[in-house]
Amino acid sequence: MQKTSSTTKLVIFLVVLGLISYLASLYVDWLWFKSVNFPSVFSTILLNKIGLYVFIFLATALLFAFNLRLTRRHMGPVEEPVYDDEEGRVIYLDDEKTPWKEFLRGKSSRWLYLGISLFAAYLVSSVAVDNWIVVQQYINRVPFGTTDPIFNKDLGFYFFNLTFYKFAYGTLMMALILLIITLGSIYLINASTNLLFGNWRQFSFAKGHMATLLAAIFLLKAWGYKLAAYDILFSPAGIVYGATYSDIFARLLSYRILLLLSIIIAAVILANIFVKKFKWILISLGAWVLVAVLMGSVYPSLIQKLVVQPNEFNKEKPYIENAIKYTRQAYGLDRAENREFNIDYNLDISDPSHQSTIDNIRLWDWQPLRTTYKNLQQLRSYYVFDDVDIDRYTVDGEYRQLMLSVREIDQEELPQQAKTWINQRLMYTHGYGLVVSPVTEVAEEGFPQFFVKDIPPRFSTDLKIERPEIYFGEKTDNYVIVNTSQKEFDYPAGEKNVYTRYEGKDGIKIKSFARRLLFGWVLKDYKMLLSSDITNESQVLMNRNILDRVQKVAPYLSYDGDPYIVINDDGKLYWVLDAYTVSDKYPYSEPFDKQRNNYLRNSVKVICDAYTGKMNFYIADESDPIIKTYSRIFPQVYQPLSAMPEGLRSHLRYPVDMFSIQAQMYRTFHMTDPSVFYNKEDPWLIPNETVEDKQVKMEPYYLVMRLPEEENPEYILMMPFTPKSRANMVGWMCARMDGDNYGKMLVYNFPKQETIYGPEQIESRINQNTEIAQQLSLWDQRGSRVYRGNLLVIPMGNSVLYVEPLYLQAENNRLPELKRVIAAFENKVVMEPSLDTALLKLFGQNQRVESQQTGVVVTPGELPGATVAELAKSAREYYDRANQLLRDGDWAGYGENIKKLNETISRLEEAAKP
């Protein structure tokens, strides 16, 4: 007894401990949501979960309690003896040798049945509670305004209604199956002895009770077949995704027959209570199984082989049209405007209308640039450049495309002896600043030309940063405590450090020892209780990773994997995150991933302050019914895009992830003629390019350019296409993103009678160019690693220019340097030290190119014909820079420039040889 009592106490203690831990975590969540000004999100989610849980719990408990009460009432005492034992004693069913009889029918059985009811209710409600969002979507649903071609229902039915009905069906089916298993077990246990001795009188009510429940399951199954019939619109088995001929005329028919059979079986089961014709149940069940097998697989297969395949196109044409129409709608491809791009190759590179494009041709790829940033601007081991972003800014009055990378803190990179609790929680709390460089400009050493660099930030343009501290970012994961008596490390200044205090309002105030105890419990950090640096005014900053942060507020959205930083007009730093509404419920739409998602909208733009962590969610696509539904559920979360500050709106980008999916779909679904689609006469491909020394698929890239028939340069995201059977280019797609044109898509088609070089053909021509091949081989022999950058296809006027950067990296030095630019136009390929000289060599003696790369005007007379003179100039520059770095105490920079000076002198000696 003592052992049992101790075990019970231990179980109770563990349950209470778990409950306290859960409530403490819940309270901390509430404090966090309150601190970020989204308390309504917490309360909406919590109340909906509680409401759904309680409703299903009570409904399931009542269902079980009612049926168990009926069962108990109709299991009356059995008075007839069962057998005599060896000593002649008569044993009754309620004898001590059958104690379960009393357990099932006696006074204590009420507690048993109550426990069963509560446990079953717990199981069903626990499974169902996470579908609270499904219920709310159904309640707050918004119609699409478009109907499907088979059932003529608004598409919102499949997104909201059908999902809710399937949830209700699954929950009811689970409850009924659990109930019939429970009651069947009780009836069998209670009447086990009667079964052995042929006493069937106790089964009259049991058979009727179980028959009623079984009939209910078949009626519910009939509803399930009705719901399943709608799934043919998402069938992956046909010539296109969605319902095809065999689905309509075979599978849909099978669902309707099975629905009718399920109702008949339910009626037969109920009738058998009175008629006692058990064989009719067996016959109806046999017919049900037979129809399920024959109509579910055999009959559709016969229809496909005997009816469809001999005349496939005519039979499938309407469904091909459906697939084309609805796939284009689901990905917004139906809104893409098609234009002709008439090629003539009469490009005047000196035309002022092309200057903005030339000034913004991207020569820096993010991978080598990040390595360069790390080597030149990391400054301390605990700083990290996690990513390189690209965006456009107006700099000194000019529209420029820039590369930016945030200098975040990575506490894992602190020296081992510095990984103390104070350093990781109170002192090293934030990153500092960022680096900015233009996409085209290259310094003499082959390094980027910095617009913003160093700590504290130094500026060479009118860009300004007033708040460089990074408390929230992509690499920032752990929690910190700010406004303590311990100063926060801000940034290094020579041999000294500069310290600061957090001035933001974000964070949960400690306030009291009770809260400190609470946070110590939830965060599993007992040192919070012992630290004398923490005061009641201290704030806990949690969920500092920006993706985790926004997902906690809106977990039902999908987020782009590439947030980017923006320098706002006020000098503050903000993260921009693209959020998507994604679904697998768009009829006939081809899926884009393994989860069969086939609907995609970039419906939300999220702005997150890098200093305070404040989040704002803006609706970017007001035509999306899904985000309209969410905004009804969470009205305090979403704002119209017009409410976003203009300085931030000017930096909104069309997301690469979404554009990649759209381009992938457009490869096939640009064919809008059913016959062309069926015969696959004109499928397109995303071309390959050579990056480093590997063949990879091209990725969409951002450009500043003046589109054909447009007056001003603008920021676009583009992707070229090639036909499947050839390597030449057939067209290109772009997404616009400036001003009112944001989100508009254009597709430019090249004339079919013209042959325009595709990226793979240009790469092949580069490989076959003897001068380029010799130079690459020479670098390789000298121990330098050649890194070939992204090939850019750049439409200009009625022509196409191709540009590819080339980086060199010494074996003993992981610092990539941009050393050459390869450019191609029409039938000519050149490789030169800079973009401007490459363009001059391409376009001849009558052209004049002024490039932002060097900031000088280059004419044919300045081409590197006088090699010795140029090398002598470079040697003087390396020497002067080395002396300056020596005076500044930069020994690493001094050594690097002396090394390059020696290399230049060696080249001078070779060039001077007769």
Swiss-Prot record:
Q: GO terms for CC?
A: extracellular region; plasma membrane
Q: Which Pfam families match?
A: UPF0182
Tell whether DNA-binding is among the UniProt keywords: no
NAD recorded as keyword:
no
Assign the protein's first listed, main location to one coarse class: membrane
Where in or outside the cell it occurs: the entry states: Cell membrane
Print the keywords alphabetically: Cell membrane, Membrane, Transmembrane, Transmembrane helix
The regions listed as transmembrane in this protein's record are 10-30, 45-65, 115-135, 169-189, 214-234, 255-275, 280-300
Task: List the InterPro entries hit by this protein, alphabetically.
Answer: UPF0182 (IPR005372)
Topology of this chain in the membrane = Multi-pass membrane protein
The domain of life for this entry's organism is Bacteria
- Which family does the record claim for this protein? Belongs to the UPF0182 family.
Q: What is this protein called?
A: UPF0182 protein Swol_1161
